[in-house]
A protein has these predicted regions:
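Short beta-alpha connecting loops at secondary-structure transitions
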Residues: 220-221, 275, 296-300, 349
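Final/C-terminal transmembrane alpha-helix of multipass membrane proteins
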Residues: 324-345
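"…together with the soluble PPM/PP2C metallo-phosphatase catalytic core" -> "…together
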Residues: 2-284
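A short, structure-level motif marking secondary-structure boundaries and short turns
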Residues: 28-30, 156-157, 296-298, 340-342, ...
Length: 349
């Protein structure tokens, strides 16, 4: 909205041209989202349900009694700030609407004693992921660019929708599984969104740089980058209160929308393999456990039998890592690995 307003007010007062700058709006949106989340969380978390702990989770008793479901506070902040700083585009409005639905699903799980069943959550996640995939492609073929090879691939609708649905479902649940240590899911996600935002804004949203690196240029890349940085701001405000020892937990109302948005942004980049680059630690920590359960439950195939998942539970119980050690080491791994993998992704083609 501010972007449109900048054009209307430019003739009245010259400095209003700042509202036409995507970089200014990204910075303003990030700071505003962080400030509003930081301010509103402690004023509303007394109304949130209390955490009841998780069966078999390491250190679950440390979280019991704390307010859970903070996503129901910071996700609306994300939506409102995004509406303020995004260019007017129907597809972005559709994305924000579905993210609110994902938040509501998570909040229902947070509020219900014992939560929703795994199958209920899985089916709802699948339906919402399908909706996200349809929003991305608009029932049109989608151009995909890949690592190593320079040629682009045009995916037909019948191929893109199931593949995109699977990726969004995976990121939604992997991020949810990572939410088990104070600050971990929020910090890893914030790092991922910062890298994603940088790629979407500075490379894929820039005609000169994208041409130099032989990757597609997306005119709406700056809009997707804005979503990424605004969510980063919300996570910064949340992490202020979630730093160990935490005062509030994001719950499914936060982790599921975060994972959903992450999958959407990766697909908006045109390269689904980017998920391994910006969210590798989240996938290893959470998604490998999902794979282990899936193979064992449906095919009676046991893998990683000596490894406890999510991986953060394994290193705490088997390696004796403290919660701060898990947080710092996992985040450092993501910070160091992502630039190296980005270099490979964009230069080895």
């Amino acid at each position: 909205m501010l972007h449109w307003l900048g054009y209307q007010l430019l003739e009245i007062y010259g400095p209003f041209r700042l509202l036409k700058s995507h970089l200014f709006l990204i910075g303003f949106g990030t700071a505003l989202a962080a400030s509003l989340t930081w301010y509103w969380l402690p004023r509303f978390w007394k109304r949130l349900p209390s955490d009841l702990g998780r069966l078999y989770a390491v250190g679950a008793n440390q979280s019991m009694g704390k307010p859970v479901g903070a996503g129901v506070i910071f996700v609306p902040v994300f939506v409102l700030v995004s509406l303020l700083v995004l260019p007017i585009d129907l597809r972005f409005l559709e994305v924000l609407a579905v993210i609110l639905l994902v938040m509501l699903e998570g909040y229902l799980d947070d509020r219900k004693p014992g939560g929703l069943s795994e199958y209920q959550l899985g089916i709802i996640d699948l339906g919402l992921a399908l909706l996200g995939a349809i929003i991305l492609c608009q029932f049109q073929p989608v151009q995909i660019w890949l690592p190593i090879i320079k040629a682009d691939v045009l995916l037909p609708v019948w191929a893109f929708i199931p593949l995109a649905t699977a990726l969004i479902w995976l990121t939604t649940n992997a991020t949810n599984c990572t939410d088990g240590v104070d600050g971990l899911s929020g910090s890893l996600s914030a790092v991922s969104f910062m890298y994603l935002g940088g790629v979407l804004y500075a490379i894929l949203g820039h005609p000169g740089i994208s041409e130099y690196l032989l990757v597609p240029y997306y005119e709406d890349g700056t809009g997707w980058a804005t979503l990424s940085f605004v969510m980063t701001g919300c996570l910064i405000g949340y992490l202020w209160h979630n730093a160990p020892p935490s005062l509030v937990l994001m719950g499914d109302a936060g982790s599921r929308p975060i994972g959903f948005l992450m999958g959407m942004l990766v697909l908006a980049s045109g390269n689904p393999f980017l998920i391994f680059v910006v969210s590798g630690v989240i996938l290893v920590n959470g998604a490998t456990g999902l794979l282990k359960v899936f193979l064992l439950r449906f095919f009676k195939i046991g893998i990683f039998k000596k490894v406890r998942y999510p991986l953060h539970d394994h290193v705490r119980r088997e390696k004796g890592w403290s919660n701060p050690q898990v947080l710092v080491r996992f985040v450092l791994l993501q910070i160091v690995l992502t630039p190296l993998l980005l270099l490979f992704l964009f230069k080895v083609r």
